[in-house]
Amino acid sequence: MRLMEVTQQRIDTINESGSMSGVGAIHISEIEPTLDYLEKSLGMDLKNNVLGSVGKKEFSGDIDVAIDVEPEAMPELLDKLKINPDIIDIAKSSVIMTKVKIAKFDANKTCDRARTGYVQLDFMPGNPGWMKTYYHSPADGESQYKGVFRNILLAVICALYDRKDSAEQTEDGRSLQSEQYLFSPTKGLVRVRRNPVPKKNGQGYTKQNNNVIIDGPWLTPDEIVNVLGLDKKEDLNSYESLKSAIEQNYPAELTAKILDSFANNKQIQDIGVPSDLQIQEDVLMYMRKLL
């Protein structure tokens, strides 16, 4: 398998930039009253379906809520939100973005982001149980790094752990058939058979791959750690806990390959390689100079 297959992989993340006009951060003490009010107004369970770092950090850039709704029911949900007076603004992309008023807003609580009295609340369609696992974010003090670091490391582990590649390869170095795990934002952890897609003219292969699910899905943290050969569900909490778990459970060669692929991932390169991996790379470079 080419390293580029893993290092160029992008992972879905929760966006905290606030795409709606006039929204700002929300303090942890304001989240529950805001959701309590909206639950009564909308007749929906919101508090049990929040995702990411909401309620784990002092301030959140927005509120993300999983909604178990079928695609054909989305127009009805949109209409319901549009006519509700507590939904001040609404827009749809891959999620439903809304602007809502913060209940019991305390202007004295400030942070390095704007505090406007309004917050963006995103409704994200999907299986709430799985989305809580996929979009898990560590609490304050639990990790130096955001949940995206954990998710990318977990995706790399899935791509390399118990991977089976055929000896035959394409001209650009891909195996003609691979079996691997895939950490999917919509399907859960699944086992797939991957084949490069042939060109229509029959001359070689395109850059695309075709994945066929052959086992799974595994949706709960307990199931995932069992399938991936780890110890306990807490291993999935953060980048640090996941890195420690593979160092304790995987052969040194596989661990090194996973961490090298993670450090070379394009997203990780863009947001910054964790300092512990930078130190390891500096030591390796020094040792190479001595040889």
Can you say where each PLM-predicted feature lies in the sequence?
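Short acidic, low-complexity intrinsically disordered linear motifs used
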Residues: 1-2, 81
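Active-site nucleotide-donor binding segment shared across nucleotidyl transfer reactions
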Residues: 35-75
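Intrinsically disordered, low-complexity eukaryotic regions enriched in glycine, serine
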Residues: 37-41, 69, 81, 90-95, ...
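Short, surface-exposed acidic
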Residues: 46-47, 85, 166-169
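Short amphipathic alpha-helices in soluble, non-transmembrane regions
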Residues: 73-84
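Conserved catalytic core of two-metal-ion nucleotidyltransferases
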Residues: 82-131
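Catalytic cores of NTP-dependent nucleotidyl/adenyl transfer enzymes across multiple folds
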Residues: 111-290
